[in-house]
């Protein structure tokens, strides 16, 4: 998800997005551990998406 889309969401929406990304990241980690993941770059992508969402969430919470 792009930063502009995240910034348009409210705090609850961003928190829901973080939870969904964390579940996806966990699933990808399990696939990697069992040698089922062919494209390991998705781990990096989801990890950075989680960090991006957490940063925007912190900015929104600090602003209010």
Swiss-Prot record:
One of its GO terms (biological process) is translation. InterPro entries: Ribosomal_uL29, Ribosomal_uL29_CS, Ribosomal_uL29_sf. The keyword Coiled coil does not apply. PROSITE patterns: RIBOSOMAL_L29. Transmembrane segments: none annotated. GO terms for cellular component: ribonucleoprotein complex; ribosome. Keywords: Ribonucleoprotein, Ribosomal protein. This is Large ribosomal subunit protein uL29. It comes from Verminephrobacter eiseniae (strain EF01-2). The gene is rpmC.
